[in-house]
Amino acid sequence: MNRILRLYAFLLPLLAAVFVFEFGVNVPYWDEFEFAGMMSGGPGFWKYITAPHNEHVMPLGKLAYYALARLTSMDSKAMMYLSVIILSIPYLLLVRRIRTHDLMAAAATVLIFFTAFFSPRSCVNLLWGFQPPYLAAFSFGILAILSCDWFLRTRNGWHLLAASLCCTAASLCSAHGLLSWVSVALAAIYSRQFRKCLASLAPAAIIAACYLVSARHFPPAAGGGGVSPAGS
């Protein structure tokens, strides 16, 4: 049974890759047309990077998408495969982490959840080429959870600091800024637990302040639609 579950766990991301191979096409979607304007890296490049995209503040995600677009020559299907890889890494880490402690827990939680997550209906979302920044945010969130788990088991302060950095990175990839507040809390615990100077709070506090300023000056459009100021 152990081998069957392990084989099943590793087959799920492979099936997602087969789905992309079968149904993916190199055709940009709506947001990708807007992002294509910055691919040249022209004079308004950095202004576009720092401007909100709808309700998202995602400079790290935009930079990642820019790099991927240049690397793949704006090949949407190549980015679909990359989306599968980005999803598979934290998934396999979760399977390995839980399996080492309780096989039934892995079967009842991770495998059941990802069976739905990698199902053909969910894999339709992978056919949107502009997924890597959002999936990177998801992956950083999973890594933050794993880092907190490692901290609880080992009491190693570096794991808690890694969780804080993962939360900040997730917020900068595509989140609405909520995870930046988690990173502040984790940094505060790190500072208190290990008697570090309060300077360890500075990066997370700056990120949170940037989100507050951005939310004040660039509120999301009604219904979450519209385009970013730089793209209008």
Segments the model singles out, each with a brief description of its role:
Residues 23-28, 42-70, 74-80, 84, ...:
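Membrane-proximal lumenal/periplasmic loop motifs of glycosylation machinery
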Residues 107-140:
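Aromatic- and kink-enriched transmembrane "portal" helix at the membrane-lumen/periplasm boundary
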Residues 112, 133-153, 181:
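Specific aromatic-rich, kink-prone transmembrane helix
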Residues 150-168, 195-200:
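Short hydrophobic alpha-helices at membrane interfaces in multi-pass membrane enzymes
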Residues 159-173, 178-188:
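Membrane-interface alpha helices of multi-pass inner-membrane proteins
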